[in-house]
Amino acid sequence: MAAQAAGKYHLVIVESATKADKIQNYLGDGYIVTASIGHIRDLPSGAADVPAKYKKEKWAHTGVNVDDDFTPLYVVNPDRKAKVRELKELLKDADELILATDPDREGEAIAWHLLEVLKPKVPVKRMVFHEITPEAINDAITNTRDLDLDLVEAQEARRIVDRLYGYEVSPVLWRKVMPRLSAGRVQSVATRMIVERERERMAFVSAGYWDLTAQLSAPDRASDTHAVTTFPAKLVEVNGQRIAQGRDFDDKGQLKSGKATQNVMVLDEAGAHSLAEALQGLQGGAGQGLAVTSVEEKPYTRRPYAPFMTSTLQQDAANKLHFSSDRTMRIAQKLYENGYITYMRTDSTTLSTAGINAARQQVREFFGEEYLYPSVRQYNRKVKNAQEAHEAIRPAGDHFASPDSLKTVLGPEEFKLYQLIWQRTLASQMADVKGTTMTVRLEGTAPTAPATPVALTASGRTITFPGFLKVYGAGFSNERGDDRGNDAESGKNVHLPQLAEGDTAAVTSATPEGHITNPPARYTEASLVKAMEELGIGRPSTYASIIRTINDRGYVVKRGSALVPSWVAFAVVGLMERGFERLVDYNYTSDMEDELDAIAEGKENRSRWLSAFYFGADDAALQKSVPGKGGLKGLIEQNLESLDAREINSLHLFDDENGVPVYVRVGRYGPYLERTIKSDTAAPVVERANIPDAVTPDELTREKAEELFAVPSEGRKLGRHPETGYEILVKDGRYGPYVQEVLPEEDPGKPKTASLFKSMDAKTVTLDEAVRLLSPVSYTHLTLPTNRE
């Protein structure tokens, strides 16, 4: 509880205790700063929270009375009742209430709820700030405003829609797929994105192709002595035909059709090795080398990226620091609350005048005038649904603390994130990277029978001025979010000798290399945030929580940094696509964000919009808001009975070599494979096989399916336990291979089981090893294979 001041005072309420302590120091006497610790009330989280007089209402389970203008039922959270009493006590002796919650919709809503619960009889002001520094707090306390009720209505509409969506659609998942699943306005769309990417991977057919790289040597005209320099070059043409590269193949493993591939040659392994051997005959000398036929030199310029907004901070922290989105936001919250950075939930790339001046001053101070861009750089957003209500994320204040000055003040993770933000902010006002790029084409005739005309190209880049890379170079993010490498300049700074048309080069070696085209990369947290941002789905403040939710619900698992969908996710997305198509449509979800923004701006009526969403509407102007015939209510009524649960949970993979359909069935106890074998002489036989959790959807090929079907469902018998006499089996389960004892039918007990070590193989594990695994004593004495890979 905040310290009691003598006499009257101004009561300031913020959201966190850390902020309260910091701001109390800045405001001093005459103010009491205390914390609400987030929301003090919300919609009921369960039946136990619903007041007795509402429990029998048909809308009580959602907490929203859809028949009374979508009136929400707000209840004070049980763990906030003591806090409410404390705030009311402090308010008794206050002569003014200042609501200083976060500067966004959520913060505006928290302020409104405080007003509704505390019912102050003194003047009320809204205080807004984007950084916690003495200057920012003094400015905010001087320039207060009224509560923005349009923002409050927009947040309430968003909360009601999310509650109706989740509480009405989730029970359909429970009945049709399995219990304890959930649907959500943004989480279901994010899950669909991940599932669609996996579908693309499953349908992808790889193509194989070869190319070769030669090492060439030639005199360097830039050298006073014309010293011979060695450099790499790639084979690009044979007999006038361009050598195929990965970009020339489609997702079915075939060369793309069109002009671009009309004169393309797919080099196979034999051809590549033959050409490599022939090229090594071009050792130089009269007519025995490669002639330079063109030299193209161009200036190279690279501009810095914009300062961080929430999404790009999450992406860069993932790519450079290997932080999850959730971890990044937790650390950023600490930095903000302790006054080190500006507000971290923003979709703006704009710096304030103070931020620009501070960044430019430190560029001069640390790197010199030549590294400062001559004029102020301005950055405009090009992403759907950007609000740009706040400044970009930057170090706080009008003079930034250097990372070195905070090394002993911040924890290791906080220091790393602060340094990243500081570097990015300074880089945004620095000079461009300057350099040159050079492409050299060389032609010759390989000594084959018959002779083969060939062409090679060598490319290189020279950085003549590092510009912003001086501060933001190491591990420089490509910001694609696709994990293709962190250093944007790596592999490109190849030094080429100065050459001119007519010069010759000798081949010193030639190395063929085989390649296979790859399916689209799975989403990582960074690339998912990037894709959601580009589609206009969700808001900066929601990305981390959405990713956390789909992980917690079991819709995705992480393999390294990649997000892999579970088979349950496939079933859930399939159900949503069949019965609630618009609710997982990317454009519809993005349009909802626009409409919620319109409510925040006072351009759309909250009640009219909610009614169109839930009940449907005939008004053409509202059709974008309607998720289907009869609105959400109509969709639930149509689909609760009509959707076929078995069909929803049956995913056709492919037909086996005999033309028999193979399905993945999503069962209550996990996914499994199933096919029905028919014969002329016997009844159909249904074959089933567990799908181990370690097998991802795109790895479940025909070959893998046959391997799983071949594992006996009853397991392989290893023999009998020497002490109990019970049969011991080795079986393959969804969590991997394990051994199990078989109890007599009359024994009601639970059989002992034990997982195999990763170094063990279910096909070769012995009875002795199984007995030791099942032993209740430590089995550290168990002799294991030496290769533990």
Per-region residue spans from a language model:
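Amphipathic alpha-helical transducer elements in NTP-driven molecular machines
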Residues: 17-20, 30, 34-37, 77-91, ...
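C-terminal accessory/connector segments of nucleic-acid motor ATPases
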Residues: 205-223, 231, 294-325, 331, ...
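Metal- or metallocofactor-binding catalytic centers and their adjacent structured scaffolds
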Residues: 249-306, 500-503, 513
